[in-house]
């Protein structure tokens, strides 16, 4: 058994690699930071191949997708966010985020699902976010990218069902998680709202364990945490305008790092 994971150098990707390794899976760990990948390689018990790859490069993405024939599970985890009002966030950084969160995932999902379908089996796990269900003022472009991840995953999963394929696609939609995400997004999550939100933030390992368990059971939309499931339910009954105001109130309490 073998799994390939992008964004495997830290956080959720690293922990999912650890969980799968403990279950006996060999790992192909993909990220840009070779030093972090080597650390992971030295820690895991099963065989670990490391690939230094920038998924914003289309050619590297296409080359990476060719490894799908070797694996049972392909996890699209690479991604990051940009925090701040839309009129002041850096355009180049946002475009790089779109390339990472949307373009790369689109390429890999398309090519890997085709390989899996021709072969007759395989499971893709795309990492979205609870943000996929909501409008996201002060995090607008990031929220929009995760909506794309959710909807393309649902659409392709249904196409595979209609084709009577054994290939599965799951999409992980976690709420706040303790990872490097806040550092990359240049925001302190919890500042100003720490007392109200600290019990909502899950550990990366808890989310990784839950995600892998549910994925292997064939769950399509995976939402860790009871409170996060309630949030998605409320999203169904509240108008988007109201939700946008609520999200803005939450986001405006976050402190941009200096």
PLM features: residue spans?
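Active-site helix of classical SDR
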Residues: 109, 145
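Substrate-binding pocket helix/loop in short-chain dehydrogenase/reductase
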Residues: 85-98
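The beta1-alpha1 cofactor-binding region of Rossmann-like NAD(H)/NADP(H)-dependent oxidoreductases
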Residues: 52-63, 91
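SDR active-site lid
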Residues: 159-226, 241
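Conserved glycine-rich Rossmann-like NAD(P)H-binding loop of the short-chain dehydrogenase/reductase
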Residues: 23-39
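Residue(s) in the substrate-gating loop at a strand-loop-helix junction
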Residues: 129
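Conserved glycine-rich cofactor-binding loop
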Residues: 9-10
């Amino acid at each position: 058994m073998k799994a390939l994971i992008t964004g495997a150098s830290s956080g959720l990707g690293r922990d999912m690699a650890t969980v799968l390794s403990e279950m006996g899976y060999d790992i192909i760990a993909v990220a840009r930071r070779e030093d972090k990948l080597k650390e992971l390689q030295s820690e895991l018990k099963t065989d670990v191949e490391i690939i230094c790859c920038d998924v914003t490069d289309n050619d590297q993405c296409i080359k990476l997708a060719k490894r799908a024939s070797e694996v049972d599970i392909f996890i699209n985890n690479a991604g990051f966010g940009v925090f701040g009002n839309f009129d002041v966030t850096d355009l180049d950084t946002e475009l790089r985020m779109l390339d990472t969160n949307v373009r790369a995932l689109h390429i890999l999902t398309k090519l890997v699902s085709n390989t899996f379908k021709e072969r007759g089996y395989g499971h893709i796990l795309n990492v979205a976010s609870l943000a996929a269900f909501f409008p996201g003022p002060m995090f607008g472009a990031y929220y929009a990218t995760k909506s794309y991840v959710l909807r393309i995953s649902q659409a392709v999963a249904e196409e595979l069902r209609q084709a009577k394929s054994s290939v599965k696609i799951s999409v992980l939609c976690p709420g706040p998680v303790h990872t490097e995400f806040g550092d990359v997004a240049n925001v302190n999550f919890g500042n100003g709202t720490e007392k109200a939100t600290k019990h909502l933030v899950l550990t990366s390992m808890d989310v990784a364990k839950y995600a892998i368990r549910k994925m292997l059971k064939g769950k399509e939309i995976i939402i860790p945490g009871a409170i996060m499931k309630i949030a998605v339910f409320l999203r169904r009954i509240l108008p988007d305008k109201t939700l946008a105001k609520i999200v803005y109130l939450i986001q405006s309490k976050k402190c941009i790092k200096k």
